Amino acid sequence: MVLAVLIGVLVGIVLVSSLLLRWNEVRYSRKQGLPPGTMGWPLFGETTEFLKQGPSFMKARRLRYGSLFRTHILGCPTVVCMDPELNRQMLQQGEGRGFVPGYPQSMLDILGRNNIAAVHGPLHRAMRGSMLALVRPASIRSSLLPKIDAFMRSHLHGWAGDLVDIQDKTKEMALLSALRQIAGITAGPLSDALKTELYTLVLGTISLPINLPGTSYYQGFQARKKLVSMLEKMIAERRSSGLVHNDMLDALLSGNDGTRERLSDEQIIDLIITLIYSGYETMSTTSMMAVKYLSDHPKALEELRKEHFDIRKGKSPEEAIDYNDFKSMTFTRAVIFETLRLATVVNGLLRKTTQDVEMNGYVIPKGWRIYVYTREINYDPCLYPDPMTFNPWRWLEKNMESHPHFMLFGGGGRMCPGKEVGTAEIATFLHYFVTRYRWEEEGTNTILKFPRVEAPNGLHIRVQNY
């Protein structure tokens, strides 16, 4: 009797599961002209498979359905595009063709609806203008690079003789460097409090928007609330004190130079959170993976050291590097770009359709997301011969940055505005790291590359003076 009931329950579960899956397919298949694909479960879609399998999920569906297929991930019906030319066109055409940013609800809620990656139209132009003014070449030369140099010189002091988790060190480095440039915050109780909340916030941005205690989304959203409160207090103190700090927050609060629209406090806070988030993610991961790749490729490390010791010739030990030094770091730039490419620090970009859009004979309905999946472009042997090999020299052979399918920093009118200052930060880190130290990896260090690049148990190196 018990066995019969158990079998009945199991059969019932199978039938209900099959009906739910079938209902979700029929629900979306009513729309005419959709690309092929599957939609998974109601609400959850195929999010679990996507986050667990990552690139394997994408490759399997491309083999089955082609370079344009439909799925349901992160709470949204989504079309994945793995075609390099279609991706280039989407990024170039942007809003004029019906494509606006389409980041998942979790990211919108946690980074803020005014974050520069999510807004479009006049607000995006205003926020992008404000950000570009902060990171233009003149600002890097006169203000940002001197601060970056002083910070890196201090942060990398005294590592010799230690067993260092370079993942932790680069995370701390990226966050503290961003806080110093944006709001003049140095290491101390305030930076520690901000660091705790920012680490939690980052984990919540790629999650299902389920607002229940214990979920990554809930924790990330609570962290955002605390960060907003801290930043509101900081802004109020700046205004009441009247002191000049000569940092990014000062520039944003002081209004404009007559050419830009003034941002509200809410917009400034969302911009600051996004600046810290994007810089932290990209800079920390790229710096860590550059150390890893250089460890594994001694010839590249030797070439990099030569470039940086040549720069130090004629400088006193405490003399800072300047903008001309940074612009002369051609091999360093190649190492950074090759690290971004091979590690795939950014897997792709999300867009949303504002109207029905025709693409390769299919119709993408209004309101759907399009995942501009650029990861496989990084491994295309037609663009990058022997693509799985770390080869910085490939970036010196021709001007790869002008290649139409160069998408390491996005594309079109949404090319990452912080590209140069981010490159300057990583280049300065490498300058002091390779001229001061030699290192060896210790233990077994596992690297995961999806949904974000990380070393789950750390990346440990034994550091000695050079």
Swiss-Prot record:
Membrane topology category: Single-pass membrane protein
Binding residues annotated for heme, in chain numbering: 416
Record pathway: Plant hormone biosynthesis; brassinosteroid biosynthesis
GO molecular function annotation: heme binding; iron ion binding; monooxygenase activity; oxidoreductase activity, acting on paired donors, with incorporation or reduction of molecular oxygen
Cofactor(s) listed: heme
Biological process per Gene Ontology, one example term: brassinosteroid biosynthetic process
Listed transmembrane segments: 1-21
Gene Ontology CC annotations of this record: membrane
InterPro entries: Cyt_P450 (IPR001128), Cyt_P450_CS (IPR017972), Cyt_P450_E_grp-I (IPR002401), Cyt_P450_sf (IPR036396)
Keywords of the record: Heme, Iron, Membrane, Metal-binding, Monooxygenase, Oxidoreductase, Transmembrane, Transmembrane helix
Enzyme class label: oxidoreductase
Signal sequence extent: none
Annotated compartments: Membrane
Substrates-to-products reaction catalysed: 6-deoxoteasterone + reduced [NADPH--hemoprotein reductase] + O2 = 6alpha-hydroxyteasterone + oxidized [NADPH--hemoprotein reductase] + H2O + H(+); 6alpha-hydroxytyphasterol + reduced [NADPH--hemoprotein reductase] + O2 = teasterone + oxidized [NADPH--hemoprotein reductase] + 2 H2O + H(+); 3-dehydro-6-deoxoteasterone + reduced [NADPH--hemoprotein reductase] + O2 = 3-dehydro-6alpha-hydroxyteasterone + oxidized [NADPH--hemoprotein reductase] + H2O + H(+); 3-dehydro-6alpha-hydroxyteasterone + reduced [NADPH--hemoprotein reductase] + O2 = 3-dehydroteasterone + oxidized [NADPH--hemoprotein reductase] + 2 H2O + H(+)
Coiled-coil blocks: none
PANTHER family recorded: CYTOCHROME P450 26, CYTOCHROME P450 85A1
Function in brief: Involved in reduction steps of the biosynthesis of plant campesterol-derivative steroids, ending to castasterone (CS) but missing brassinolide (BL). Catalyzes the C6-oxidation step in brassinosteroids biosynthesis; the conversion of 6-deoxoteasterone (6-deoxoTE) to teasterone (TE), 3-dehydro-6-deoxoteasterone (6-deoxo3DT, 6-deoxo-3-DHT) to 3-dehydroteasterone (3DT, 3-DHT), 6-deoxotyphasterol (6-deoxoTY) to typhasterol (TY) and of 6-deoxocastasterone (6-deoxoCS) to castasterone (CS).
Protein family per UniProt: Belongs to the cytochrome P450 family.
Protein name (Swiss-Prot/TrEMBL): Cytochrome P450 85A1
Organism: Brachypodium distachyon
UniProt lineage: Eukaryota, Viridiplantae, Streptophyta, Embryophyta, Tracheophyta
